């Protein structure tokens, strides 16, 4: 094969295959072939063959080219650099460029994870104590704080600003503190309602007294409130405070409010100086700030100065919105110079800029204000033609509302409906998707005109579009129904308002319920009010007052009694005047004791079924204490500071409507009792104790208040075996005392895993905690029960019941079927010994889990724990409170009278059986 033939073959191979060949390898092969006579063309090698026949052994050439020996004087070819291997991933350069742009966009949208979060292994950075505190970011508006924000916003939308303010203010003292966004929402709502003094007071409360860090929006709102109230100097003080102390600079909105206030106060020179200061601080030229100054100079008649500022704005403003042209148009219309006004309008249209809804709305209002309806309709139609969402938004609900209101003002109701549904005439224009504000406006307008048929049609259309429910439209419909004497429809609309969780404000609710009761809708009013009480926030006390008085005047005493019970249960509170009225009415009917029993009862907050046991009870919706509510003694430590309560310890995880073991009742001197809910179970009284005897420490209540609790075995509680524990239901503000322990002391209670050991800590080998052998003054009498009344004690078998009755002072308290004189030693136990309570089987939980507090322990008192509960059993610790002056449980030195080890083991085996 010749060299040229081989080169052609190699060239063909390299052009038809995608895998490239190494240039150095190709040169080496060509070099070997050129020196090998075996590969030469036969026609050109005839002479060489003859020489080889003549000299057969002359430089023999092997057949394998790889074994060919290159002469020493031969110079090897220069090696070329290797070509890197690259696959052709794109068909064109444009496709490759598009891929690069896509990757860059993705990096901008999705930054790498290491840029989003800090390395978890790295220690947290230390905060500079001298660094200024920064306001909350939007990432703080999550979880419970977001729920609080939504609740406040719902109250604001319902126009119940007092309830929203109360909720936000009282949340400062809870674990869920409001964010700066929640504070700004209620402050802005007060400003919009022209309640400037309350807005300023809320700012002082949140950001100065409650130590919440304000942001620039907070300062802008308080500056705006000061300016509208006429206190421009106070607004300037806030502005100087921002410059001196805030970790951010004032925004353009800050200068808008300040220049507006200064111009309204007649200090236009100070406003101009503030504009120069804004520009010197690097702020961009703002058309609204310039418009405030131009409006001020036009009002003063200084047209040249206004034009000067307008020219300055056009030279500095990069994006002009056309609002200043509307100011000049209004000025010329007021002067009666319509020609100049329209010339200013045409100059604005000649700019061919995209008109946004705020600018178009201002121009529409100017045209309609001065009777230029043709120009207004032409501008409205042009805005509809240019509306092509999502890229171009030329119309909003305010735009349509302006023209609809003009139609109602002129009495053209059919034209109002057509305007409401009007669409642009251009091919590219799209219909405006009306929001709930637009539907609320047209429904309100029809209700004002008494056109309930059209109002109902648009109201139903808004509901069918799944728009968010709004309180103003519901209130307008209810008022229209009452005005038209359609009482049943008014009741249905009020019921729907409650169903969609809209707030019924105090003034509106009192007026509507009064009208319903006046028209004989007593039962319906009570039903709607009951449904309102099941939701948060609770109805205002004034609404309850109107309904209760109406029911009493209508001789519906049973329903009035139920409503009063709901007021007590919801912690709404009964005023003194209403209380006297109710008692007087029921006394005339001979039912005074019945209503007094309800009025003197005290509701206890019930934890929701979804809450865990290690969280404090839910704060009622309406704060404050009921007059009959018992107060917590001051010397008790609150239970909320303890972290040892488990979710299955029976803290009232009941179903809806269940009360956790009863409620506080003032039983005219009766002592509290533990009452069993079963019919065949007897009550065990904690009363009738002789002088010198000390009641259990957990039952100490304030004078005049007793606690009636029950061993109620209700379904839905969190005990493992269905045995419910019913020792909660405290009123708002009451907390379970856990024994005034000094720091460092902790009591480990029940619900420990089998691997955990419960032991009587820090006792000497000779010390034993005695439940018996107490002096006559130190014994606890277990209720002087009649003979035969036995207390079933935690799943005992038949015949294994303990009688706690009829004990004399010299008798001892038998624990777990002990005979008189037997003592139960709780100390000196080895690790393998285990205490059991009253014949429990594996997996059962004793009903005696009313964990009594350790009374008044001091720093020298030891920590109490039980020893090694049997696997599957939940240890039933009953800390004793048989304390006298020393407030310590009895201890006894080791002696012959103690229980021996064999007796103890026999007792344990017997209890297991």
UniProtKB/Swiss-Prot annotation:
The keyword Mitochondrion does not apply. PPR repeats lie at residues 179-214, 215-250, 251-285, 286-316, 321-355, 356-390, 396-426, 435-469, 470-504, 505-539, 540-574. Pfam families: PPR, PPR_1. Residues 674-858 are annotated as: 14 X 11 AA approximate tandem repeats of W-x(2)-Q-x(4)-Q-x(2). Residues 74-84 have a biased composition (Pro residues). Residues 134-167 are annotated as: Leucine-zipper. One of its GO terms (biological process) is embryo development ending in seed dormancy. Residues 108-130, 899-913 have a biased composition (Basic and acidic residues). The keyword Transcription applies. InterPro entries: Pentatricopeptide_rpt, PPR_domain-containing, TPR-like_helical_dom_sf, TPR_rpt. Residues 650-666, 673-690, 706-727, 762-791, 815-845 have a biased composition (Low complexity). Residues 34-138, 607-913 are annotated as: Disordered. It is found in: Nucleus. May function as a transcriptional regulator essential for early embryogenesis. Interacts with RPB36B through its WQQ domain. Belongs to the PPR family. P subfamily. This is Pentatricopeptide repeat-containing protein At1g10270.
């Amino acid at each position: 094969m010749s060299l040229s033939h081989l080169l052609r073959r190699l060239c063909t191979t390299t052009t038809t295959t995608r895998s490239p060949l190494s240039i150095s390898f190709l040169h080496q092969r060509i070099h070997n072939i050129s020196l090998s006579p075996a590969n030469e063309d036969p026609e050109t090698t005839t002479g060489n063959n003859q020489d080889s026949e003549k000299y057969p052994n002359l430089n023999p050439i092997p057949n394998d080219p790889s074994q060919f020996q290159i002469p020493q004087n031969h110079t090897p070819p220069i090696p070329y650099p290797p070509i890197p291997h690259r696959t052709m991933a794109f068909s064109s350069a444009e496709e490759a460029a598009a891929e690069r742009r896509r990757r860059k966009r993705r990096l901008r949208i999705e930054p790498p994870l290491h840029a989003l979060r800090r390395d978890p292994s790295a220690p947290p950075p230390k905060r500079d104590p001298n660094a200024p505190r920064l306001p909350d970011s939007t990432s703080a508006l999550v979880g419970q704080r977001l729920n609080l924000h939504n609740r406040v916003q719902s109250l604001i939308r319902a126009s119940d600003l007092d309830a929203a303010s109360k909720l936000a203010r009282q949340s400062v003292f809870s674990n869920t503190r409001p964010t700066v966004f929640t504070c700004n929402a209620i402050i802005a709502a007060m400003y919009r309602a022209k309640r400037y003094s309350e807005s300023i007071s809320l700012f002082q409360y949140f950001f100065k007294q409650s130590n919440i860090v304000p942001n620039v929006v907070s300062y802008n709102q308080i500056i705006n409130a000061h300016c509208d109230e006429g206190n421009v100097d106070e607004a300037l003080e806030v502005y100087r405070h921002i410059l001196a102390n805030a970790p951010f600079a004032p925004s353009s909105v800050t200068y808008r409010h300040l220049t507006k206030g200064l111009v309204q106060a007649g200090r236009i020179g100070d406003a101009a100086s503030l504009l120069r200061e804004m520009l010197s601080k690097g702020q961009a030229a703002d058309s609204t700030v310039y418009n405030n100054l131009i409006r001020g100079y036009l009002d003063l008649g200084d047209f040249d100065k206004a034009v000067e500022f307008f020219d300055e704005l056009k030279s500095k403003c990069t994006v002009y919105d056309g609002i200043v042209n509307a100011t000049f148009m209004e000025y010329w219309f007021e002067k009666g110079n319509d020609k100049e006004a329209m010339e200013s309008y045409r100059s604005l249209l000649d700019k061919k800029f995209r008109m946004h809804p705020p600018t178009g709305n201002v121009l529409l209002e100017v045209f309609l204000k001065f009777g230029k309806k043709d120009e207004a309709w032409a501008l409205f139609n042009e805005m509809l033609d240019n509306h092509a969402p999502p890229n171009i938004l030329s119309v909003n609900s305010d735009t349509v509302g302006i023209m609809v209101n003009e139609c109602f003002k002129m009495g053209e109701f059919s034209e109002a409906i057509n305007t409401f549904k009007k669409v642009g005439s251009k091919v590219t224009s799209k219909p405006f998707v009306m929001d709930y504000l637009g539907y609320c406006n047209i429904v309100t307008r029809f209700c004002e005109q008494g056109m309930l048929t059209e109002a109902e049609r648009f109201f139903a259309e808004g509901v069918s579009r799944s728009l968010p429910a709004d309180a103003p439209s519901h209130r307008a419909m209810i008022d229209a129904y009452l005005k038209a004497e359609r009482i049943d429809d008014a009741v249905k609309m009020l019921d729907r308002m409650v169903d969609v969780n809209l707030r019924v404000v105090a003034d509106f609710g009192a007026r509507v319920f009064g009208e319903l009761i006046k028209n004989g809708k007593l039962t319906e009013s009570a039903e709607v009010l009951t449904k309102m009480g099941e939701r948060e926030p609770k109805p205002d006390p004034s609404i309850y007052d109107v309904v209760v008085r109406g029911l009493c005047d209508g001789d519906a005493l049973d329903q009035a009694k139920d409503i009063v019970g709901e007021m007590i249960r919801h912690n709404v509170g009964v005023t003194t005047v209403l209380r006297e009225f109710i008692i007087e009415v029921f006394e005339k009917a001979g039912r005074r004791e019945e209503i007094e029993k309800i009025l003197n009862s005290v509701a206890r907050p019930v934890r929701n079924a979804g809450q865990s046991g290690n969280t404090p009870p839910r704060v009622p919706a309406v704060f404050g204490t009921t007059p009959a509510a018992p107060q917590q003694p001051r010397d008790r430590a609150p239970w909320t500071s303890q972290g040892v309560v488990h979710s299955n310890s029976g803290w009232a995880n009941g179903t809806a409507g269940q009360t956790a073991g009863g409620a506080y009742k003032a039983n005219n001197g009766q002592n509290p009792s533990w009452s069993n809910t079963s019919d065949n179970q007897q009550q065990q009284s904690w009363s009738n104790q002789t002088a010198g005897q000390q009641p259990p420490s957990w039952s100490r209540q304030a004078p005049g208040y007793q606690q009636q609790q029950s061993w109620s075995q209700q379904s839905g509680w969190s005990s493992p075996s269905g045995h419910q524990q019913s020792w909660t239901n405290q009123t708002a503000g009451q907390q379970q005392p856990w024994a005034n322990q000094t720091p460092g002391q902790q009591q480990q209670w029940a619900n420990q895993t089998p691997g955990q050991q419960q032991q009587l800590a820090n006792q000497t080998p000779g010390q034993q905690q005695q439940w018996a052998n107490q002096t006559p003054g130190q014994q606890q009498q277990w209720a002087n029960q009649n003979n035969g009344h036995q207390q079933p004690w935690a799943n005992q078998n038949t015949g294994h019941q303990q009688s706690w009755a009829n004990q004399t002072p010299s008798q001892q308290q038998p624990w777990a079927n002990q005979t008189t004189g037997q003592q139960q030693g709780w100390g000196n136990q080895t690790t393998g010994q285990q205490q059991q309570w009253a014949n429990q089987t594996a997996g059962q939980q004793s009903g005696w889990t009313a964990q009594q507090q350790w009374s008044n322990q001091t720093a020298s008192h030891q920590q109490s724990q039980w020893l090694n509960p049997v696997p599957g059993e939940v240890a039933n610790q009953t800390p004793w409170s048989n304390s006298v002056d020393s407030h310590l449980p009895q201890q006894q030195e080791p002696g012959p009278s103690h229980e021996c080890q064999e007796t103890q083991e026999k007792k344990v085996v017997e209890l297991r059986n």
